């Protein structure tokens, strides 16, 4: 059911997980190697509503009081994923750099949350130029808010 809900959200234009907010890294064989989902933080509540409605309908759970992971004033990286078979090839770095360029075109810094229990991911983000801007909690997990500003 979760997979079906997420597929529906990707297919919509008014969802935080919309194909319109997604960069896809493809291999030479047209396999999906990785994805990066990002959107204007000012639109979080508007874009999240599709998930809230879908979760109520699919699971009977109300997520309307979920913590905000972003705010206005940044291009927020919601999700970054590289398939296991394609890791270690610089795909995450390429997706991040393309997303940072998107933020530059929008005249916004690019931000993300990284779980404090994932120092390897934080090292990757910092190696690209992200810097620590504050602590946050999301989904009950302590998170670190990182941003990279336009040069």
Give the positions of each predicted feature.
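Conserved acyl-donor/pantetheine-binding loop and adjacent beta-alpha core of acyl/acetyltransferases
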Residues: 39-75, 79
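Short glycine/proline-centered loop/turn elements that form peptide/ligand docking sites
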Residues: 92, 96, 118-121, 138-144
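Conserved acetyl-CoA-binding loop-helix of GNAT-fold acetyltransferases
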Residues: 82, 88-101, 123-127
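Conserved catalytic-core motifs of GNAT/GCN5-like acyltransferases
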Residues: 41-43, 111-113, 126, 131-145
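Conserved GNAT acetyl-CoA-binding A-motif
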Residues: 73-75, 87, 103-116
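Short coil/loop residues immediately preceding or within conserved phosphate-binding loops
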Residues: 20-22, 72, 77, 109, ...
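Conserved beta-strand in the GNAT
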Residues: 24, 31-40, 76, 81
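Active-site rim helix/loop that mediates acceptor-substrate recognition in acyltransferases
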Residues: 1-22, 27-28
């Amino acid at each position: 059911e979760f997979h079906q809900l997420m597929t529906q959200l990707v297919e919509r234009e008014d969802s935080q997980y919309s194909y319109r907010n997604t960069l896809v890294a493809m291999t030479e064989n047209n396999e999906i190697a990785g994805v990066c989902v990002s959107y204007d933080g000012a639109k979080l509540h508007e874009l999240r509503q599709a998930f809230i409605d879908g979760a109520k309908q699919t699971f009977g759970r109300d997520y309307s009081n979920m913590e905000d992971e972003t705010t206005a004033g940044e291009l927020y990286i919601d999700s970054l994923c590289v398939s296991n078979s394609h890791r270690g090839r610089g795909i995450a770095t390429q997706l991040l750099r393309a997303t940072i360029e998107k933020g530059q075109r929008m005249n916004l810094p690019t931000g993300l949350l990284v779980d404090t229990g994932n120092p390897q991911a934080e090292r990757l983000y910092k190696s690209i130029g992200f810097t620590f801007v504050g602590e946050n909690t999301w989904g009950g997990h302590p998170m670190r808010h990182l941003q990279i500003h336009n040069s």
